[in-house]
């Protein structure tokens, strides 16, 4: 009835103490693809006069740093404040998109000053490349069997993730009717929310931006579309994603991801109404 989580080793290979993880490999592939697509876009549209590799490298590094810091602050500050060295274990997962966005904005602001280019021109160029990283990150989450979805006992294509037992016990203690399912399968069936987000925030968002950018747009409109679209898609996907156990549902209603996405939508809508005519 349900789908067993595929037996995927999160480590691709190891040489001595060095271990290559799928999670990091996904981001590497997305970066390489973004460089290729970015060069192709510049050649076709002649958007900006900045070295593409340097631009993407700086923004990529800044977004990774921001993503890690954002995760620490927004999602698990109490743990990392007591385990500071664990903050460096990026290969184990634990990145915040919203933190990464802040890091990318800081990098773009720096580059805009250094290269004397409007920051919105840089962001309009970068935005179509972002879904590559988002999609890659979600596939990495799936391989790591992390950020799994909420329980879905009535969904025949729900996944049986191998590392949800502790959380499932807490759920069964409050919902004893699920005990039989837990006894039979060992874990509770859940939505593969990582795959939902891969399709929504990766593939679907890419095509939204792709078709929008086929025509010449006012400066900032592509960035505004991204803020609005991602914010909406993230809020939707969060309804299928298990809230982080250390936070849960804030006020028993809303997730941290949804809270952080609301300002994105507001800023995008305000920019469209105030500056794009």
Swiss-Prot record:
GO MF annotation terms: phosphatidylglycerol-prolipoprotein diacylglyceryl transferase activity
GO BP: any one term: lipoprotein biosynthetic process
Main location class: membrane
Residues involved in a 1,2-diacyl-sn-glycero-3-phospho-(1'-sn-glycerol) binding: 138
Keywords: Cell inner membrane, Cell membrane, Membrane, Transferase, Transmembrane, Transmembrane helix
Keyword GTP-binding: no
PROSITE patterns to which the protein is assigned, alphabetical: LGT
Similarity comment: Belongs to the Lgt family.
Role: Catalyzes the transfer of the diacylglyceryl group from phosphatidylglycerol to the sulfhydryl group of the N-terminal cysteine of a prolipoprotein, the first step in the formation of mature lipoproteins.
Identification of the protein by name: Phosphatidylglycerol--prolipoprotein diacylglyceryl transferase
Gene: lgt
């Amino acid at each position: 009835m349900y789908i067993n989580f595929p037996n995927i080793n999160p480590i691709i290979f190891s040489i001595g103490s060095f271990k290559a993880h799928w999670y990091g490999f996904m981001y590497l592939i997305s970066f390489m693809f973004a460089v290729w697509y970015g060069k192709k876009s510049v050649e076709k549209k002649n958007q900006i006069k900045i070295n593409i590799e340097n631009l993407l490298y700086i923004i990529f590094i800044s977004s990774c740093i921001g993503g890690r810091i954002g995760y620490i602050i927004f999602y698990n500050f109490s743990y990392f404040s007591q385990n500071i060295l664990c903050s460096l274990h990026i290969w184990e997962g634990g990145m915040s998109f919203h933190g990464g966005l802040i890091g990318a904005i800081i990098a773009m602001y720096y580059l805009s000053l250094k290269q004397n280019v409007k920051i919105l021109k840089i962001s309009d160029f970068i935005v179509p490349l972002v879904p590559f990283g988002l999609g890659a990150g979600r596939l990495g989450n799936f391989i790591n069997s992390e950020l799994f979805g909420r329980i879905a006992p009535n969904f025949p294509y729900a996944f049986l993730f191998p590392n949800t037992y502790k959380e499932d016990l807490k759920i069964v203690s409050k919902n004893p009717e699920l005990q039989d399912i837990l006894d039979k399968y060992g874990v509770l069936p859940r939505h593969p929310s990582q795959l939902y987000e891969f399709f929504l925030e990766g593939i679907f968002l890419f095509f939204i931006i792709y078709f929008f950018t086929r025509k010449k747009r006012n400066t900032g409109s592509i960035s505004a579309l991204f803020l609005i679209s991602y914010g909406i898609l993230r809020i939707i996907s969060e309804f299928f994603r298990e809230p982080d156990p250390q936070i849960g549902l804030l006020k028993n209603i809303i997730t941290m991801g949804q809270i952080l996405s609301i300002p994105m939508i507001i800023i995008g809508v305000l920019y469209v109404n105030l500056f794009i005519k």
